[in-house]
From Swiss-Prot:
Its main location: cytoplasm. InterPro entries: DnaJ (IPR012724), DnaJ_C (IPR002939), DnaJ_domain (IPR001623), DnaJ_domain_CS (IPR018253), HSP40/DnaJ_pept-bd (IPR008971), HSP_DnaJ_Cys-rich_dom (IPR001305), HSP_DnaJ_Cys-rich_dom_sf (IPR036410), J_dom_sf (IPR036869). Zn(2+) 1 binds at C164, C167, C220, C223. Keywords: Chaperone, Cytoplasm, DNA replication, Metal-binding, Repeat, Stress response, Zinc, Zinc-finger. Homodimer. A zinc finger (CR-type) spans 151-232. Zn(2+) 2 binds at C180, C183, C206, C209. Its cofactor is Zn(2+). GO terms for cellular component: cytoplasm. Belongs to the DnaJ family. This is Chaperone protein DnaJ. Coiled coil: none annotated. Residues 4-69 form the J domain.
Amino acid sequence: MKKDYYEVLGLSRSATKDEIKKAYRKLAMQYHPDKNPDNKDAEEHFKEVNEAYEALSNDDKRRRYDQFGHAGVGSSAASGGGQYGAGASDFSDIFSAFNDMFGGGKQRGGFEDVFGGAAGAGGRRGRASGGIHGTDLKIRLKLTLEEIAHGVEKTLKIKKQIACTECNGTGSKSGATETCPTCHGSGEVRQAAKTMFGQFVNITACPTCGGEGRVVKDRCVSCYGEGIKQGEVTVKVTVPAGVQDSNYLTLRGQGNAGPRGGANGDLIVVIEEKPHEKFQRNGDDVIYHLALGFPDLVLGTKVDVPTLDGSVKLTIPPSTQPETMLRIPGHGIGHLRGSGRGDQYVRVNVFVPKEVSSHDRELLKELKNSSAISPADQNDREEKSFFEKARDIFS
C-alpha cells in the first residue's frame, strides 16, 4: 500500500508550496543515489520523494489527491499502452528543483545537464556528455564598514572539490569508460506501475552511473573513480562599494568541480557586515554620536570628528541644541549603483559629568541663577511675548 504523500515529505496537509519544495529538496539530497550507492532502501525512498513532490507541487493534482487519494492522482498521470500521460511533462518541475540545488537555478548545470531538459510525451532525455555538474559552494565574507564604503578586493583561500590530478578528473587511470550495465547508456531507470486507470511510468536517475550513461574503467585509486578530491585554492573577490549585509556575489565556475569531468559549480560569496564601534549605518549614510560639554554647545566650538576617511574639523554653531544632527557631505558609503557617496551625520548630545569638584559646583550654582540660561525664565518670556503680540493684534 502506498504511503501518504504528506507523510513521505514529513508535512501537514496545510503545508505551503514553499514548505513542500523545501522538504523535497532536503529529502532528495538525503536519499540521492550518488550519496547512497548500492543502497536499495535509499533508492526506494528517493523514488517515493519524487512521486510525492510530483503530485503535491501541482495545484490541480494536489486538489485531486486531497479529495480522492492516490487514485485521483493516478488518473491524470497514467494512460494506456505504456505511453506518457499528461502528468509526464510535470517531471520538469522535479528536475528544475534539482537545478536549484545543484546549479543555483541556472539553465545549465544540475540535472538539466544530465537529462537534457524535460522530455515531451514519449520523449527521452539525453545524457550528459561531460560528467555531472559540480555543486555550488557558499562562503561568508566579513567586511568592515570602511571596506564597504570604498569597495575592496580580497584574496581568499577556500577548501573545495577540485579535479583529481592523478586521472585529470576522469575518474579512470586510463581515462576509459564503458556503457553503464544498469541503464545501458540511457542514464535513467524507468519503473512502470499498473493502476486501475492505466500504466504510470516513474523515471529516475540511474543509481549506478548517476545519470551519465557510462561508468569508468580502471578506477583511479586516488579519487576512487569520482574524478574529484578535496583541495584548497586561492580566489580573488572584488567587492564593489555599497554592498549590504546578506548581499551576495556569484563567481561563475569557481565552485566545486564536477565528478568525472563535469563543469564546475559557482562560488557564492555572502557579505557579512562587521559591527562598527563608532558608526551606525543608515542606508548609504552613517551616523556618529558626539558628546560635548554645556559650554561648547552654548558658545560654539570646532572639534575633530572621525569619519570613514579619517578625521575632519567640524564647526559647532553657538546655541546648538542637544540631538541636533550636523551633516558632513560625501563622507558616507559609496553608492552601489551610480556614482557618489552618502553623507555622515553627527548627532550632538550634551555631556553630563558624573562627578564635579567643589569649585565647579559653586560655579554651576552661580550659573544656574543666571536668568539668561534659566529654562523657566525663558518659557515665561516666550509666553509673555506671545500674549503681548496677541494684545497688540486685537487692540
